[in-house]
Design a protein with these regions (language model features):
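N-terminal presequence-like segments and the immediate start of the first folded domain
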Residues: 5, 9, 14, 20-97, ...
């Protein structure tokens, strides 16, 4: 235990160091989830393209196999879909704080990185990022990009 005792029916937490302090009710701490989507976007399964809750935005992995067969084209297409979803959420790419890039072949990293680099070029603070080879991706995609952003309007 972390030195705290919380009783689920009480509005107080007891700590060893400070005694009781008030905790807002759950309804005041948790906002409803809101779906984010772009009309006409193709989905590759039973999921929501994006979700907003508690000042955060989570976008599902974006792929664009229609953009072409090479990694650069698919990266540009996935990033364009991310831009559209962020716009639907009422923010810009500057709100992105983390990106995860999945590649079907890590040998295509540099090709993806050139397109991604151009996308983040204008950002004052570039998102934290992870990139790795995931093997086979949905619909034969070469690249899939997942992002998390801050709801700057919250």
């Amino acid at each position: 235990m972390c030195g705290m005792i919380y009783h689920p029916t009480s509005r107080h937490v007891l700590t060893k160091a400070t005694g009781y302090f008030d905790v807002p009710p759950v309804s005041a701490r948790v906002m409803a989830k809101k779906a984010i989507s772009v009309p006409g976007s193709k989905l590759y399964g039973p999921y929501t393209p994006g979700v907003m809750a508690n000042g955060m935005i989570w976008l599902s992995g974006q792929i664009d196999v229609e953009a072409g067969g090479d990694t650069a084209s698919q990266t540009a297409g996935a990033l364009a879909k991310i831009d559209a979803l962020l716009e639907a959420a009422g923010v810009t790419k500057d709100a992105v704080c983390f990106a995860q890039v999945l590649l079907d072949d890590i040998g295509d990293f540099q090709e993806m990185n050139e397109v991604y680099g151009a996308w983040v070029e204008s950002m004052e603070i570039k998102p934290a990022r992870a990139a790795f080879e995931a093997g086979a991706l949905p619909a034969g995609a070469k690249v899939e990009i997942v992002v998390q952003a801050i709801d700057t309007n919250h």
